[in-house]
């Protein structure tokens, strides 16, 4: 009897050890997970984000959604639509500096002059240009960031979203998943 108890305990220990070893293996973090870590660090540091042109309220909303998911024990994975419920509209920027703000100011010019010569803003190429029902949507992007500019034919009424740390491809996956991006 004693032998069976010892054997059972040994088997349980081996099984538990195997499970622990498998769960301890590091897995590659998705692009969205890395982005959300940056969000958490930035929000914890300050109310002002010092490395991206993006509203504090948007960061806080993203972080709130992320924490809700963790609390609900939903597994975080590559499905970006689970982290981003919607793209918020922005009219102001938290700027890293006057030079960066000037670049964005050029991009927001009411005559869209930046489209005539160089179709690039802040190192991001023009990826999509659409005009529908009087709303002009312009999307710039690269492998690191996305800039969305919406204009509803009123030079003073811009909706702008800049997302640092999320590629254009990952950002556009939101649209494919049926989520309304607001443009």
Protein language model features and the residues they cover:
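Early exported N-terminus immediately downstream of N-terminal targeting peptides
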Residues: 25-99
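Long, charged/polar, surface-exposed segments that mediate recognition or autoinhibition
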Residues: 84-129
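Acidic, glycine-rich flexible loop segments
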Residues: 120-145
């Amino acid at each position: 009897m004693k032998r069976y108890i010892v054997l059972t305990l040994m088997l349980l220990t081996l099984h538990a050890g195997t499970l622990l070893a498998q769960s301890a293996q590091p897995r590659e973090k998705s692009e969205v997970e890395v982005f959300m870590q940056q969000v958490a660090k930035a929000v914890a540091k300050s109310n002002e984000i010092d490395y991206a042109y993006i509203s504090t309220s948007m960061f806080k909303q993203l972080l709130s959604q992320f924490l809700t998911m963790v609390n609900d024990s939903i597994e975080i994975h590559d499905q970006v639509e689970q982290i981003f419920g919607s793209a918020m509209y922005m009219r102001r920027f938290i700027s890293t500096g006057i030079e960066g703000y000037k670049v964005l100011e050029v991009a927001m010019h009411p005559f869209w002059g930046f489209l005539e010569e160089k179709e690039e803003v802040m190192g991001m190429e023009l990826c999509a240009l659409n005009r529908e029902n009087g709303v002009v949507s312009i999307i710039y992007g690269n492998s690191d960031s996305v800039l969305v500019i919406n204009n509803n034919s009123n030079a003073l009424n811009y909706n702008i979203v800049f997302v640092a740390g999320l590629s254009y491809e990952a950002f556009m996956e939101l649209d494919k998943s049926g989520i309304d991006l607001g443009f």
